[in-house]
Amino acid sequence: MDTIIKSETIGVERKSFIFDLRENPRGRFLRITEDANGRRDAIVIPAPGLEEFRRVLDEIIAAHDQAG
């Protein structure tokens, strides 16, 4: 069974994104769930990959800002 350490939800247009930092016997991970009109899709990022995930996301945001 997963233990939720922290959970945050954001709404963007007609979608909700749920960010759950979880832990189970295999380790800690981030689950990002997209809820769009009742349909849910999720990705899971193991804790060791969170810094790299953030680095790439920061680069994407910077490119978006530069593109205007």
Locations of regions flagged by a protein language model:
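Positively charged, low-complexity terminal tracts
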Residues: M1-G68
